[in-house]
Amino acid sequence: MSETTKDDGSSQKKSVRKEKRAYVLRKWTQFDVGRASTVGTVHLLCLLAPFNYKWEAFRFGIILAILTNLCITFSYHRNLTHRSFKLPKWLEYPFAYSALLALQGDPLDWVSIHRFHHQFTDSDRDPHSPIEGFWFSHVLWIFDTDYIREKCGRRNNVMDLKQQWFYRFLKKTLVLHILAFWTLIYLWGGLPYLTWTVGFGGVIGYHGTWLVNSACHICGSQAWQTNDTSRNVWWLALLTMGESWHNNHHAFETSARHGLEWYQLDITWYLIWFFQALGLATNVKLPTDAQKRKMAIRR
């Protein structure tokens, strides 16, 4: 096993990939079955959406998908995972709760997995590297809890969040919040709203996030020496709210801004900048010129 050092001084362990185990013919935990059922239900509702079309339902689904998935990138990713900026708790918690409605899990689980990804990028301990195949990195890893635990170990990398009652509460009551959300949507607008909001909107959010894990480690360009497969994929920037400038992100993990060039669309950064201008987002981290010179690929 070898070790490389990133620009922020953190180490990243590399090792030889383990032989990939059988996927279908294995023990499925209750959590695996539950998550697969949720993802399957969302995709089924998406398939039903065209047969339940209403303009107002379609419009609401698009708006809610944008808002909840922006909360994933703003809250779960840049605020909670990387501490790229700081918010007052009265603002941090509502954003985290809104991200919960994007159906990508509770904050403790999401943040832990992503921190492991950066700690073990493209090694046999990376929870979702495309070295085990596109579809594994895109979605299949989600349904194999035991394998992820075997690769990464105990999820003791989120103690900063576990110390807060709010995040422990969300983890324990995740299913109740999701069921309540789905029920309210159905009671408000019936099947059209359910299919376009939970189904269509959920699928957009799922695959936007998943493409960062898969496509952004396979295709695209590299501007920085990150010693991994991370890529900048311009055509995913809008769908991912700026997350697809993934090589930028792996080079400067704690940066609140992923689209480092003026022409690199980064909607999440624009929101962070807005709150910074209001004095609500503080300790906003950006790479220095010295860090950029150190990490730049010499052409």
Swiss-Prot record:
The chain crosses the membrane at residues 55-75, 174-194, 262-282. A motif (Histidine box-2) lies at residues 114-118. One of its GO terms (molecular function) is oxidoreductase activity, acting on paired donors, with oxidation of a pair of donors resulting in the reduction of molecular oxygen to two molecules of water. Its cofactor is Fe cation. Its main location: endoplasmic reticulum. One of its GO terms (biological process) is unsaturated fatty acid biosynthetic process. The histidine box domains may contain the active site and/or be involved in metal ion binding. Its EC number is 1.14.19.-. A motif (Histidine box-1) lies at residues 77-82. Pathway: Lipid metabolism; polyunsaturated fatty acid biosynthesis. This is Delta-9 desaturase-like 2 protein. GO terms for cellular component: endoplasmic reticulum membrane. It is a multi-pass membrane protein.
